[in-house]
């Protein structure tokens, strides 16, 4: 499909097919697929045979099938995975990809997704500037996920294992006779076939693994099974940190670091694991994802760069009190928590006010007859005299605006009320009455005593 004129070409045989990069959401990687060409591609190909003299183009399809062909192919940048592109631009020193003169600007959503991934991998910072790790990743001719895994493997003397894992992830799974998703089974099978030089369906995977070893100057293959499944999980987590998953209540159910749920078949050996790292999965929006390739992992093997610390202050409605915990997390997954002994007063008050908007009916005595009577009195006066512009003291409004009136009543001579027994003692009627200006209180007492 080149636009150059090639001397001597008189005949073109067009298969009607071409190889294109397709993004696979299961592995979050791109791979080549053979697919049908569009009509503009067919015209371009036919033109090769008639540039300098009459020529012939043999099209290996029927004229009747042309109505099924799209008229024009869409630019690859519209649907491509942009992680490598964004990283390359950052390596050139440009943090804003839209400062380049694109013929077709990349979709903003795809750019943001790529930036988020590269930030998670540690290849760029939050400002879009490339990091030292990102510089190394950018020099490797593979997807940033794979490059990150192979580079990190060097620090753990696991480079050959990382090359085998990368090859297994990129190709179609040869183990069609098992529903077990443990990728370690594939690594063992690959090494066994490679040692016996009976590759068969493993040939392409072995070739890719060899290419990766050559890329990192580690030419000798490893055909032993002297690797730990947890090593496999650790390497996968370097490439897919958002796909670390923790077991939840039901057997075979896990929650990903991004908050989504996935499920393994109950017969899968990985159901016994507390933590797994997933290399290949498929998940539809709102549905439980299906895992294809994964490995066990232990928290001690987590990359410290993806662990975040935070103080979590929240209202526990079951216990009826504030719970203050210092937490270590990977995404939305809790690794470890410990109680916080000293909490800022403002943070306590803010937490109670936020909880009031959601649980306020059970936290305070809103159903007290005196509270209901006061609300009815004020509502009647507001109905009779709208010109008074009386404040809204309906329960719904007061709950949603608790931060405006409640803080004063939560501080009892320096002691902040933080449990339901203390909050039930707050005089809600008096608190509501004090919201109303004094001159309007007099009018209410006179019109609705």
Question: Which residue ranges define each predicted feature?
Answer:
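Conserved segment of the helicase C-terminal RecA-like domain
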Residues: 8-11, 17-69, 85-87
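Residue-level signal for threonine
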Residues: 1, 38, 130-134, 143, ...
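Acidic, serine/threonine- and proline-rich low-complexity intrinsically disordered segments
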Residues: 158-253, 258, 274-447
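Amphipathic, interaction-prone secondary-structure segments
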Residues: 264, 446-449
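C-terminal accessory/connector segments of nucleic-acid motor ATPases
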Residues: 59-194, 204-225, 230-248, 252-266
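Conserved two-lobed SF2 helicase motor
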Residues: 1-5, 13
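Extended active-site and interfacial segments that coordinate phosphate-rich ligands
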Residues: 15-19, 27-28, 32, 38-40, ...
């Amino acid at each position: 499909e080149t636009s150059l004129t090639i001397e001597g070409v008189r005949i073109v045989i067009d298969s009607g097919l071409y190889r294109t990069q397709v993004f696979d959401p299961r592995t979050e990687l791109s791979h080549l697929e053979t697919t049908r060409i569009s009509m503009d591609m067919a015209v371009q190909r036919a033109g090769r045979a008639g540039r300098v003299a009459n020529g012939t183009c043999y099209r290996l399809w029927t004229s009747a099938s042309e109505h099924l062909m799209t008229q024009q192919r869409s630019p690859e940048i519209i649907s491509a995975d942009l992680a490598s592109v964004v990283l390359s631009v950052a390596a050139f020193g440009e943090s804003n990809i839209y400062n380049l003169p694109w013929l077709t600007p990349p979709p903003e959503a795809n750019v943001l997704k790529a930036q988020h991934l590269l930030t998670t991998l540690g290849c760029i910072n939050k400002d879009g500037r490339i990091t030292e790790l990102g510089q190394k990743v950018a020099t490797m001719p593979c997807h940033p996920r794979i490059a990150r895994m192979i580079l990190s493997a060097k620090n753990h003397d696991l480079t050959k294992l990382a090359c085998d894992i990368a090859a297994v992830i990129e190709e179609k799974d040869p183990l069609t006779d098992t529903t077990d998703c443990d990728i370690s089974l594939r690594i063992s099978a690959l090494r066994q076939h490679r040692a016996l030089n009976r590759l068969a369906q493993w040939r392409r995977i072995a070739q890719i693994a060899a290419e990766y070893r050559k890329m990192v100057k580690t030419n000798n293959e490893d055909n032993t099974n002297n690797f730990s499944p947890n090593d496999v999980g650790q390497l996968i987590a370097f490439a897919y940190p958002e796909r670390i998953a923790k077991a939840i209540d039901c057997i075979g159910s896990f929650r990903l670091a991004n908050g989504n749920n996935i499920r393994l078949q109950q017969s899968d050996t990985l159901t016994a694991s507390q933590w797994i790292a997933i290399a290949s999965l498929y998940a539809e929006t709102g549905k439980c994802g299906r895992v294809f390739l994964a490995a066990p992992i232990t928290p001690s093997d987590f990359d410290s760069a993806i662990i975040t610390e935070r103080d979590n202050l929240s209202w526990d409605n079951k216990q009826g009190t504030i719970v203050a915990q210092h937490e270590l997390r990977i995404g939305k997954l809790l690794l470890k928590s410990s109680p916080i002994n000293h909490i800022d007063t403002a943070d306590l008050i803010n937490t109670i006010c936020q909880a009031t908007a959601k649980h306020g009916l059970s936290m305070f005595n809103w159903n007290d007859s005196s509270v209901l009577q006061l609300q009815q009195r004020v509502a009647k006066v507001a109905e009779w005299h709208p010109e008074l512009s009386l404040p809204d003291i309906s329960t719904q409004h007061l709950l949603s605006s608790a931060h405006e009136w409640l803080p004063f009543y939560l501080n009892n001579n320096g002691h902040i009320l933080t449990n339901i027994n203390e909050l039930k003692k707050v005089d809600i009627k008096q608190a509501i009455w004090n919201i109303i200006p004094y001159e309007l209180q007099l009018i209410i007492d006179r019109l609705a005593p």
